[in-house]
């Protein structure tokens, strides 16, 4: 049961961060987001059904992988052309002791999440603007080979395709690459970095 609760907490944090990044970077028009309070902080969440359906499918898969301890990283990739990555946001999960954070750590977790949301807003508002209306995003779930095979054959996870990606070197020839460590939430073993190619 504790693994399920911990997975729920992490997936909720990932959902908040993905929505906030999409809003702050202007990947979708601001009018499809509504302000909500979470972690005692204002956040923006999508009210656009196609986007919500996509995110729900990704997060459902992430939650199951977390419960099985097979999720290594959730990566949000912003691109203009399929092979032209502009930004990459990696939420990495680090192996740690099992069990839930103690009650006092949940307060610390909430404070860390407030800090993360603030840092995302501050740091990404200073980043170069993305080309208006021409950017898209996709989410990659990094997992084990065994989990990939199991999920790609499980009918309840067939709402979107499971593809095995090839590791490619960044095609940033002649472009500046920025790596910004955004946050670390030690109690849950969650670390977030952003790679911005300009």
Swiss-Prot record:
Q: Does the keyword DNA-binding apply?
A: no
Q: Name one GO cellular component term.
A: zeta DNA polymerase complex
Cited InterPro entries: HORMA_dom, HORMA_dom_sf, Mad2-like
Q: Which cysteines are joined by disulfide bonds?
A: none
The domain of life is: Eukaryota
Gene3D superfamilies found in the cross-reference section:
HORMA domain (3.30.900.10)
One GO term of the biological process aspect = DNA repair
Q: Which residues form the HORMA domain?
A: 4-196
Q: Which UniProt keywords apply?
A: DNA damage, DNA repair
Query: Per the similarity annotation, which family is this?
Result: Belongs to the MAD2 family.
What do we know about how this protein assembles, alone or with others? Accessory subunit of the zeta DNA polymerase complex, which consists of the catalytic component PolZ1/DNApol-zeta and PolZ2/Rev7. Interacts with the apurinic/apyrimidinic (AP) endonuclease Rrp1 (via the N-terminus).
Q: What does this protein do?
A: As the accessory component of the DNA polymerase zeta complex, involved in translesion DNA synthesis (TLS) and various DNA repair mechanisms. Promotes the apurinic/apyrimidinic (AP) endonuclease activity of Rrp1 and is therefore likely to be involved in the base excision repair (BER) pathway responsible for repair of DNA lesions. It does not appear to influence the synthesis activity of the catalytic component Dmpol-zeta.
Q: What is this protein called?
A: DNA polymerase zeta subunit 2
